[in-house]
Amino acid sequence: MEAHVGKKALVLGGGAPDYTLMTGALLAFEEAGVKFDVYSMAGGGGVVGLSYLAPLNMTREESLRNSVNFGVSDAIYNMFPINYKIFTKPGPAASLYRTALSMIPGYSRIVNQLGMTPSEKFLSDYVQFWWAALMPSNLSLFSEGFCAHAQFIKQMVDFDALHKLDADIYLNAYCLTDNKMAIFKKDQIDLAHFQASLSYPFFYSPYELNGKLYIEGASRDAFNFKGLMENEPDLDTIVVFDAIGIDGLLHEPRNLWDAFGQQIITPLVALGHADLKLFRELHHDKDKSDLLVLNFKIPPKLQPAALDWSSSNLNRLFAVGYESGQAFLEKNGSKLGV
């Protein structure tokens, strides 16, 4: 029988493509029966949290295991190191093209890789590669972002089911119109609000929602501590998954493309460190809640490829996350009622 441990919150910070560190750790928590009353999410943590809490047409465990399937088969990624399954082309014609593709008989069997063998996943990725290559685009020098706002979440989350959950859920986005952080609550969160929360500059144009423009919240508050502090003053235990403040993500670039990834992640790693430190000093030390941080340790040999969208990297990080989650529970399980 679970001991009474009070009100618990899980904080899922930004992180991509190393988000499978968090899905792996969450699987360890799910298997151990750990439940939370509150979920506070930012950036890639929103992908992890929403797909876990309200998975579309699969169980929570299946959804967590399926997270690795949004990477690209290595045989393709080694030749074309872009995740065309996550980042899709912008424009009205591209939108119509995606809609037409989704109406093809057997479409879901091609894109849903849960339960596929490695060979089947390669064939799926190969078909999706040509779909992406043939997709029209209106990208130009006058575009405000490279990609259409996140489409992949449609395959992952049942937003109607999300609204029926008992847990309190918070997702952040930064409002450019008001120049302040916006906190979306469970009843508000739908496809549009999610896309607003993940609109990282350059990759995506600012997302217009109810006449206001938004960018990714994790670009300003890597963990959505603001949503937690403003709405949940009576927490007993706060667990933070820190997949962004990892110094091992920084390394000597392997090539110009890798250098591009490094210039994006470098300020985000610093932001993750600063946000967590600030939360400890300004909020946590003044209350009685127990703050537990799961720091992911990526082995040195895996660090150079830790920001790759290859299937092998996502699988490796998932395994690291799972082992990290198990180790965390061995040390802190009693504080979480397991």
Residue spans for each PLM region:
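Glycine-rich beta-alpha junction loops
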Residues: L171-D178, D221, D242-D247, F296-L302
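C-terminal helical/tail subdomains of lipid-metabolizing enzymes
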Residues: A148, L276-V338
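A short, conserved beta-to-alpha structural element at the edge of catalytic cores
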Residues: L235-R254, L268-V269
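Structural motif
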Residues: K8-A9, V38, L213, T237-V239
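Acidic, Ser/Thr-rich peripheral helices and adjacent loops at domain boundaries
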Residues: E252-K277
